[in-house]
Every structure is written in C-alpha cells, then in structure tokens.
Regions:
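Short, charged, low-complexity loops and linkers
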Residues: 1-3, 26-39, 116-118, 150-159, ...
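Hydrophobic alpha-helical segments
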Residues: 1-2, 8, 110-111, 120, ...
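Active-site-proximal alpha-helical scaffolds that flank and shape metal-associated catalytic sites
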Residues: 6, 42, 65-167, 200
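Short alpha-helical hairpin
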Residues: 8-34, 49-51, 173-182
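Alpha-helical bundle segments that constitute or directly flank the non-heme di-iron/ferroxidase center
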Residues: 12-17, 31-60, 122-136, 206
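A non-catalytic, amphipathic alpha-helix used as a structural packing/dimerization or gating element
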Residues: 39-50, 71, 75, 190-197, ...
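Long amphipathic all-alpha helical oligomerization modules
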Residues: 164-196, 207-210
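Acidic, carboxylate-rich catalytic segments that either coordinate divalent cations
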Residues: 190-228
Length: 228
C-alpha cells in the first residue's frame, strides 16, 4: 500500500466526510445556492493572498517539480482564479488576513506552521486535501457531468480540470509516498496526523460555507466579509 493510501485509511470516515461534504454533494446535484457557493469563494481570497508555498521552497528536493509548479500557480492564482471575480463586490479588504473567518484563518495558520516546522513530506500531507481538488472536483465533474450548476460554479470547477492542477496533485502525492517510504515510524505517524488535521480544517471551511456562518468568539452578530 502506498503511503498516501495509508494516510487516507488513517483519516478513515473523516476523509469520506470531506469527499461527500453536503456542500460538495449539493454542487454535484446542481442544488448549491449562490450564497453558499460564494461564501466559500470569498473566504478563499485571504488564502490566495498568502505566500505559504514560498516558505517551503528550501525544503523541496531537486528532483521534485513542486516548487516549479507552485511558482507558476502563484502567478495563475493572482490573475485567473475565479474567486477574484468577487472582488468588485466585496472589495480588496477581502484579500487581507483580517477578512478570514475562524475556519479559514485556522487552516492558513495550520499550513504556515507546518511549512515552518515540518519536512517537505509533512507539508505535502498537510496541503494534500487542497492540492487534490483536481480529483475531488475536476475528475468527478468529468465523470458525472452534472447539470444545473450556475455559470460561475462551472467556471470554478473547470479550473480543476486543467492538467496543470493534476500535475500539482501528482507531485504532492509523489512526495508523500517518497517520504513515507524512507522516513522513521515517528515521522510517518506525524505525517498521518497532518493529513488528518488538514482534512478536518478543510471540512471546517466547507461547514462554514454550508451554514453561512463562522463567528469569531465574542463577536455577537457576525460582521465583516460574508459574515452570516
């Protein structure tokens, strides 16, 4: 069994809960409301403004294309990501760290801490749930060919059909398998936990979008970008 499969097995029902989250299932059923869809899109804007991958570049082995692809992704995400179409309505503040609601802020900080403290294998385990959108959304869309999606939803999913994103998933998975095979039992256990926790954080971002709510402690009535 490849180590990526061990990680998914370790995550167990959590991984399945992510793959079949109500937000995702509603999208593929053609029933996802514009409000729930745009909540997730707009809350992705603070992430697109970070430089998390650059922290990890010194840890990438020369034979892995992850750094090369992430440099290209940084350019692409700053110019063509569908999320950017929401900026005219919500304003540039939505790209700042202060616009992030708790679950989005949590996953960003989880990735940053992993990038600083972890190995390249750790980083790939922590981010795999995001790097695998080409499978979660792109491949599933091609297989199921759902109808009833809004034009913006189709445009967003089509991002993940781009072979470029499949390359990112492939090199991330390659690193997970390589490090999982070569490292110690202690490090493998850490990688499994990072995979699990990254998946749980991502579920949280979809929970927030599904519930249209993600309040900060003590906030009372939610305020800010896409709050309530």
């Amino acid at each position: 069994m490849k180590f990526i499969e061990e990680c998914k097995s370790f995550a167990g029902p959590v991984w399945e809960s992510y793959l079949h989250h109500p937000w995702i299932e509603a999208m593929f059923a053609g029933d996802l409301s514009d409000e729930r869809f745009e909540y997730w899109l707009i809350q992705d804007l603070p992430y697109l403004s970070t430089n998390i991958a650059e922290i990890a570049f010194p840890k990438v082995p020369p034979h892995n294309k992850w750094e090369e692809l992430q440099r290209e992704y940084k350019i692409r995400s700053g110019e063509t990501r569908v999320e950017l179409q929401t900026l005219e309505r919500v304003g540039d503040f939505a790209k700042t760290r202060w616009a992030a609601r708790p679950w989005r802020d949590g996953i960003i900080n989880f990735w940053i801490r992993t990038a600083y403290e972890g190995t390249f294998g750790d980083i790939c385990c922590a981010t795999y749930v995001c790097d695998a959108f080409s499978h979660t959304f792109g491949e599933r869309y091609m297989l199921e060919k759902p109808t009833g999606l809004s034009e913006l939803q189709v445009e967003w999913i089509e991002q993940w059909i781009d072979p470029f994103h499949e390359k990112i998933r492939a090199v991330t998975e390659e690193a997970i398998n390589e490090y999982g095979e070569q490292t110690t039992d202690y490090e493998r256990d850490k990688m499994r936990w990072l995979f699990l926790r990254g998946t749980q954080y991502q579920i949280g971002t979809f929970d927030a979008a599904w519930n249209l709510s993600d309040p900060w402690p003590g906030e009372g009535e939610e305020t800010g970008v896409i709050a309530g």
